[in-house]
Structures are given as structure tokens and as C-alpha cells.
Amino acid sequence: MRLKIMELRYKRELEKLIEKAEKSLEASENLYNSEFYDFAVSRIYYSMFYCVKALLLTKEINPKKHSGVLKMFAKEFIKTNELDVELFEYINEAYNYRQTADYDATIEIKKEEAEYLLHKGHIFLNKTKKYLISKNILKGENDNTKS
């Protein structure tokens, strides 16, 4: 019943968040390929952040601050074992890289670090989409049914 209500209230926003997550990850790849590693890790973090916001919408939770988003993600999905703890580790790591990249001009993000985080970003997005598809909230790639 809760997911049916969510579908009516949040489905469009959830789909837009996943779209933003995909675009952020694509932008991070372009930035990585242009050797803008600091900017790439920031976009990778935001890709994960948008995924988490979409996941929280499935429980009708919509925190406004980054700290609230991460806290509620841990409470609602990680501590309940609904999703793997590695996803929380990935977004925390991405958050720390983003903080460094955005706010510490003396530290340069290395190519290997950006590449590593980009890989984690793809895993995060794929696992988010897989979860949403498994809950019949998001259509699968080959699903032509109406959502």
C-alpha cells in the first residue's frame, strides 16, 4: 500500500532523480576523460546522492540537507539490511573526496582516485536501479510495460 501511495506522489520526482544520477555520472566520465579529476569526483558524489534521494522517496522521506540524506539512508536501508553496507561506504567515500576536491585547493585528486570512484559510481547507480526495478518502482531496460 505504501509503495502505491508513493507511486502517485513521488514517482515523477524519483524518475527525475535517477535521470540526474545518470547524467551526473556521464558528466563525471567526460570530466575524467578531460583530466578534470577534481570536478569528476564531485559529479560522482552527486550521482550517488541523487540515487539515495530517489531511494528515500520510496519510503516517503525527503530530507533537504546532505547530512540528513546520508543519515536517513543509513537508517532506512543499511541498518535494515535492505541494501548492502558497501553502498553506504561508497557514498561516504565519495562525500569525503568531494569535500577535498571542492574545498581544499592544496590537494589534487589523482587519476587513479577518480577512476576508482567512477567505478564505484557505476556500481552504486546500477544497484540503485536494480533495487527500484525489483520493487516495481522503475521500469527495467527491456520492460515495455507502463510504469
From Swiss-Prot:
Record field: transmembrane: none
UniProt keyword annotations, A-Z: Toxin-antitoxin system
Pfam family, one: HEPN
Gene3D superfamilies reported in the protein's UniProt record: Nucleotidyltransferases domain 2 (1.20.120.330)
Highest taxon, organism lineage: Archaea
Function text: Putative toxin component of a putative type VII toxin-antitoxin (TA) system. Its cognate antitoxin might be MJ0141.
Family recorded in the similarity comment: Belongs to the UPF0332 family.
Name of protein: Putative toxin MJ0142
Lineage of producing organism: Archaea, Methanobacteriati, Methanobacteriota, Methanomada group, Methanococci
